């Protein structure tokens, strides 16, 4: 009811369904042009084609128990997420965001958080818009133009924007 009452556009919204299982943190992922790895997370990597940043450590939850394993080999400031992690290797004009990006199990344990998913969603939306405007496939757009658009819309496309 909060959304209906306070957020314009939600007046007629309704809950259609909920997940069959709570706490699912990982699902299928694409094989992308680039793959986010635990080394990239741990080493706070920077990428020329970054479209989002994440500053969450690697937290791996036990799928059957309650144990939590934090991987903190050194203090993680934040790391860039490259555009190529959203671009499938073998499909054109498709962008994938959230926990389905091209990432290793360990890297996804950091990147799957909501704030990062929202940043990647914004990047994908602007990339799709740029793709239509430039009459190019999503994988062929200028990532530099995308980064400029993200910055114009108040996003932080990478560490160098901090």
Language model regions located:
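Flavin (FAD/FMN)-binding glycine-rich loop and adjacent Rossmann-like elements that form
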Residues: 1-162
């Amino acid at each position: 009811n909060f959304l209906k009452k306070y957020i314009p556009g939600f007046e007629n919204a309704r809950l259609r369904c909920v997940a069959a299982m709570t706490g699912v943190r990982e699902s299928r992922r694409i094989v992308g042009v680039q793959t986010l790895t635990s080394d990239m997370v741990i080493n706070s990597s920077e990428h020329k084609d970054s479209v989002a940043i994440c500053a969450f450590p690697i937290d791996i939850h036990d799928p059957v128990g309650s144990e939590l394993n934090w991987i903190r080999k050194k203090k993680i400031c934040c790391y860039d997420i490259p555009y190529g992690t959203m671009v499938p290797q073998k499909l054109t004009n498709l962008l994938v965001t959230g926990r389905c990006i091209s990432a290793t199990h360990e890297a996804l344990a950091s990147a799957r958080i909501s704030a990062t998913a929202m940043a990647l969603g914004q990047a994908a939306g602007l990339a799709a818009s740029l793709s239509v405007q430039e009459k190019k496939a999503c994988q062929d757009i200028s990532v530099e133009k995308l980064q400029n658009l993200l910055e114009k819309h108040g996003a932080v496309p990478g560490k160098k924007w901090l």
